[in-house]
Amino acid sequence: SSETAEAAPAPVRIDAARQAQWNAGQIVLPRAGDGHFYADVSVDGVSTQMLVDTGASVIALTADDAANMGYLWDQQDVRAVAHGAGGDVYGVPITLDRVQLGEIEAHGVRAIIVPEGLEISLLGQSFLARVGRVEIDASGMILGS
């Protein structure tokens, strides 16, 4: 076999379920068996697994994840915060102090707590827009420079 020189090494797929590969300043998330991409994200120092959702305008937290992160709310704080495929989405708008995915970190990130109907927290555009590149290719989803 012959090798060709490249400016940067091509990402290599790691087949282990939900195992991310790190390169300098970027992460490659493998496609899970269900076709989606998942990331282990730290919010204010608390790690949780999120579904990467490029169609979500902000991070959406399940009630359990929000509580584990120390975010509390009253039922009276819940209001229509977005419109999804199934109609209005009800939640509580908040700002997350620090969101980190590997070396990629953002502060003051908009989010919503969705008390009902959300099975897994969503990593949306309020974070993804800050990572630089978001691309999907044969190796997986590439986040970062």
Identify the residue ranges that each predicted region occupies.
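Pepsin/retropepsin-fold aspartyl endopeptidases
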Residues: 1-49, 54-145
